[in-house]
Amino acid sequence: DISGYCQEGFGVFDRTVFKGQRWSASRAYLDPARGRENLTIVTRALVHRLNLSGNRVTGVLYRDRHGALVNAMARKEVLLSAGAVGSPHLLMLSGIGPKSHLEAMGIAVKADLPGVGQNLQDHPDFVLQFKCLQPVSLWPKTKPWAMIAAGLRWLVAGDGLCASNHFDAVACIRSEAGVEYPDLQLTISPIAVDENWSPLQEHAFQIHVGLMRAHSRGSIELRSDNPADPPRILANYLQDPRDRELMRKGIRWVRELVAQPAFSALKGVEIFPGAQCQSEAELDAKLNSHTSSQWHLSCTARMGPETDRLAVVDSDAKVHGVSGLRVVDASIMPFVTNGNTNAPTIMLAEKLSDTILGLSPLASMDLPVWKSPNHKNAQR
């Protein structure tokens, strides 16, 4: 179970799909509440900053779809849920963040929190591609007539090829003996695509290598004091040499996997990075040019005690140094989860919603993470 306590092994991805449609948190949680009298949803708006009176957050200033500036006042608290990029961006625009950086941007400092925008974590991703010897890949299904047929089936029945993202199979593995729980994730796709996500014009498949416990840390910084300017995102993928070593191990593990007899009828030549790419220098060159993101950005407003210099929120998600403000999204994770972040973020939000409402928590469960009995001596 990629989201459970026993993660190690091969399995099928859980997906938030309902009746053939991708089911976002908005559809699952917001749509059923749209009719509530105490809920107003404002779309196509850009929040400029949080309003503060002294050290208390009193509301938000935003520009609506017509270009008018609107002050929304809070009766109790403001909950910031703009994500691992948007939340630190808005905090800093509001004067909550690293003092030196805010002053350099000409922003008055309301709370000096050095950790805002720091500690950026993600799951770096690298793809290996192989020719498929059997005509079983999805390549023919990318032809116009096939896509029309798949679309019609989805419209009528809500199933078929259009009801999946086709990342069905996943493996969570330990890179070597001594590693307690998975630090690599392999995601298998029945089609290979180029850098622009256009399908290769042949039967092929690809396997993604994801670093689940990367050591490198990035940051989010302001580009200016203009809310419309996107922030600077420094991902810093593979900056730590340990991450390069782990990614190289992942590549070699994939090659070992597809060399097994079970793959012999399917696996053709390695398209990318190519079987000739073997040395550390050759692999590093490919990693430098082709490492990408699994879009699991997190940890830029991390939770921790006030004694932690880089902590931004406390255990109830309240922002240190100010009152009337909580951050509720993946930015408050201290460390990125060693699996996909969607389910953990929803779990985090559900837990904090109970905390905000003052509901009694469920009875705690002491369920330790499963470890292979021989993990100290064997990789598998």
Label each residue range with its predicted role.
Residues 1-3, 11-14, 136, 151-344, ...:
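FAD-dependent oxidoreductase catalytic-site/capping-region signature
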Residues 48-49, 85-87, 309, 334:
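Glycine-rich nucleotide phosphate-binding loop and flanking beta-alpha elements
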